[in-house]
Amino acid sequence: MSKKKARWRKLDNAAKLYSAASNKKDTRVFRFYCELKEEVNPDVLQEALNQTIEIFPTFLMVLRKGLFWHYLEPCNLRPIVKEEYKEPCSRLYIKDKKTLLFEVTYYKKRINFEVFHVLTDGTGATEFLKELVKNYLYLIHKVNGLEPVSLLPEDMTVQDQEVDSFLKYYSKDQKRPKKRKLHAFQIRRKKKDGNHLHVHESVVSVQAVLKRSRELGVSMTVFLTALFMMAINEEMSKMQKKKPVVLMVPVNLRKFFLSSSMLNFFNWIEPGYNFTTQDQSFEAILKYTKEFFETELTKEKMSAHISELLALELHPILRLAPLELKNLCIQAGAKYSEKNTTAIFSNMSAVKMHASYVPYIERFGVYTNTPKFELCLCSFQDKLSFAFTSRYDTVNIERNFYRLLKEQGIASEKVKPEFPKTDEPSEQEMKVYKIYSFLCIAIVAAMLVTEYNFHPRIRWTLFTAGGVVTMWIASSIGFFKRYNLLKNAMWQLFVGTIICFIWDALTGWHSWSVDLVLPIMSVSTLTAMFVTAKVRKCPVREYLIYEIMAAGYGLILPGILLLCKVVKNPTVSMFGALICFLFLVAVILFKGREFKEEMQKNLHV
């Protein structure tokens, strides 16, 4: 395979949605794992990971924010293999914190690969894990005569991996008719520990499922989709059955369009069945599901859906909306669209390894963290691994599903959960912050009550209350932006100067906020950023945009205030603006290429 370093890139259509909609509970992280027939050696696994990342440099990315969109940027971070230490599919992307978007862990005989959906989809994750497992097994067993093999095309390049296939196959001419979506039945019964993700796995025979599917004249996915809808229906009340059971079924678009991309490239269909108005027999449900798949799974319909999604993203007005506004709209849209589906069924298909490596592997498995009840499956050899994930009480639905399988002559074997005792994320920092916020609120409230009742001649109560509010705002910015010191400094500059303007206005406007505070804070912040970047030896791409923002703020705002004659004593303000101007000139002269690249990244639409 041709090796070349990855470059910064725009997010694909699906990644733009995931970057906006992910949160602490809905992490949009999924786990693909391989269970071996022997205990994992962490040192060898680390060496195998180092080799794998050379093949897939597109994974060495961090998520950054631009003015209009997020983007992915190469970084110097390297993945470190760890023993499994937290709940499966926990958050990988933490706002403002520079972290990789994937993680490799191990536990006993299991190698786990977890990845944020912004980085890749199920197909990309499968290829990465296969390469990792292959490298690991070769390093362990080469002394026994195991030969190295290639799993990827020799002529595949990094450019192939980075192709945005959504854009490649987008066509303005493709349109699909609008369909009115009915609200689907929702699973709402929360577990007592509903904040935790519950994973229940079982294994069945691939051949048994295929045999029964062929007898019925349908594909494995159609067969299992019908059973899944029936299992959900059995737990619905008469009132609940007025709404249809609708499953979201992801579709790998590489089966319709030629693509070697490691980025997201999938679509979905939504088979739904109303058990009140339609025949409830298994034969009728299976017939409906088969016809639905045959109708929807066509290249033309997939292409039309791609065009529909891209048309919204590429709308000339919507593209120019600020990122934060886009995020709010995407989050609202994602929340609304949840009403249209009951659960998710994702078939990752068969994982294939070279014959010489098969004897060392027990099975592969996959599951994901979503706000919905989800069934994921993948197969290896004759083992079909099912994984139900949910934060709701779905035990009865799972029981129904396996009972229905048994009625079709397919036995299942439960997989005993093997997870270490996880380190719960520390809530101590947030607890301290909440106590601090409570004390600040208490002091401000006490000062206002004192002011109202005693009317002190020197209004020290209001000054105290204002000082506490100012201190709380500054420390809150420091707390929530603690992962990025340079962004923290920029926010402190922006909010700090606004607070000073307010204080100046409330005390009779003596112009000290614009004459002194604004230029001094701007130059001080710019200097602090420069020193911090040098001391921490940050790459240019990590600090340049913040220095440009600080210098621009220290030049443009004082300039406007000078022109509007708001500044009474212009000397300090003019010298501050001069320093910021010279800094920007120096950036253009000495860091012109980096400056241009940062502007492209942060202003791309």
Across the structure, where does each feature detected by a protein language model lie?
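Hydrophobic alpha-helical transmembrane segments and adjacent interfacial helices
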Residues: 439-453, 470-478, 493-510, 526-533, ...
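Membrane-interface helix-boundary motifs at transmembrane edges
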Residues: 425-427, 476-488, 535-545
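N-terminal topogenic module of multi-pass integral membrane proteins
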Residues: 416-468
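Central hydrophobic cores of alpha-helical transmembrane segments
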Residues: 226, 489-496, 544-554
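Membrane-helix interface and helix-disruption motif detector
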Residues: 444-466, 481-486, 502-521, 539-542, ...
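Generic detector of multi-pass transmembrane helix bundles and their immediately adjacent loops
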Residues: 510-605
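Non-catalytic, low-complexity flexible loops and terminal extensions
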Residues: 2-13, 102, 110, 119-127, ...
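Acyl-thioester-dependent acyl-group transfer interface
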Residues: 1-67, 77-102, 234-415
